[in-house]
């Protein structure tokens, strides 16, 4: 069953939602903070509420659920989730691949094609989920993401899973990747992000890890989103309204929008190193601007 857009979508301003890239090292609270968006969706959007759809490409659902369960609270009804399954690759397949690596020359490995590449279909599963989002929680389907309004939010967790799925779609389990393989995979990741950021009106949050990359324009090294190769990372921030660095110092978690060593930007938060890890101010600022005449 596909659930149509609810009637309350017309009560919200007809303005595209926020596009937020939340990036940082592991353990800095990226997935956990999605709970603040769910809660803010109830507090700020009133009776209409903001429905949040979490697409898990990496292990993270446990952390998201823990935002409520660890505090002894029920999981709100406005959060939906779907987890993409890992490729159906067994240890026997890994043994076969290891034997080829152990016996074939580098040139032979580079020329080989993975006969089991069709098993690496995660990227296709991601697109299918975006074409008609299936809720693992209720069994309902909620239609294509590009038909949603600003009463809905898509969360993709995270960029590393998207990277792996795209590259595996191109090469399968082939151990040696050519420059063309990397280029095709990068192009697919860029296309899916541009489609969501530029052609969808729903709110969008992308979670990702970071790495240090050379700034090809200004020189030097900057903290950027971890993605395929070096050419794609500098293109990604321009697609988003906010690019935020997640930070943990001891037992304190913050969002940094001012770090000059990172490729950051913000439209909906103060430029500061110690913003609280909370989506409520971001959504509140968006609502104020969207309702302005």
Indicate residue ranges for each PLM-predicted region.
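C-terminal regions of RecA-like/P-loop NTPase motor modules
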Residues: 1-7, 14-18, 253-293
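Amphipathic coiled-coil/heptad-repeat helices and related helical stalk/stem segments
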Residues: 5-6, 30, 189, 229
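Conserved P-loop
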Residues: 10-138, 143, 147-150, 161
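Short His-Asn-centered micro-motif
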Residues: 23-25, 54-58, 156, 207-209, ...
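Conserved, well-folded catalytic cores of nucleic-acid-processing
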Residues: 40, 129-133, 162-165, 199, ...
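Hydrophobic alpha-helical membrane-insertion segments
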Residues: 65, 166-167, 250
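P-loop NTPase motor core
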Residues: 143-235
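Phosphate-binding/switch region of NTP-binding enzymes
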Residues: 199-278
């Amino acid at each position: 069953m596909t659930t149509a857009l609810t009637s309350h979508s017309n009560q919200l301003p007809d303005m595209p939602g926020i596009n937020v890239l939340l990036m940082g090292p592991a353990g800095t609270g990226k997935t956990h903070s999605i709970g603040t968006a769910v809660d803010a969706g109830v507090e700020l959007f009133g009776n209409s509420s903001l429905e949040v759809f979490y697409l898990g490409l990496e292990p993270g659902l446990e952390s998201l659920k823990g935002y409520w369960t660890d505090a002894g609270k029920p999981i709100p009804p406005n959060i939906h989730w779907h987890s993409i399954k890992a490729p159906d690759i067994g240890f026997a397949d890994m043994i076969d691949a290891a034997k080829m690596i152990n016996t074939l020359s580098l040139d032979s490995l580079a020329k080989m094609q993975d006969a089991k590449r069709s098993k690496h279909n995660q990227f296709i599963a991601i697109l299918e989920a975006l074409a008609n989002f299936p809720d693992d929680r209720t069994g309902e389907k909620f239609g294509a993401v590009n038909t949603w309004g600003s009463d809905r939010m898509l969360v993709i967790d995270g960029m590393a899973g998207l990277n792996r799925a795209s590259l595996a779609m191109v090469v399968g389990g082939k151990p040696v990747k050519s420059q063309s393989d990397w280029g095709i995979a990068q192009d697919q990741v860029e296309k899916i992000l541009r489609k969501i950021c530029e052609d969808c009106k729903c709110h969008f949050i992308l979670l990702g890890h970071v790495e240090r990359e050379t700034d090809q324009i200004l020189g030097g090294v900057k903290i950027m989103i971890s993605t395929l190769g070096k050419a794609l990372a500098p293109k990604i921030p321009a697609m988003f309204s906010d690019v935020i660095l997640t930070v943990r110092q001891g037992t304190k978690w913050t969002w940094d929008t001012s770090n000059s060593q990172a490729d950051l930007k913000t439209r909906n938060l103060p430029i500061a190193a110690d913003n609280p890890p909370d989506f409520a101010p971001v959504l509140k600022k968006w609502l104020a601007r969207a309702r302005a005449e």
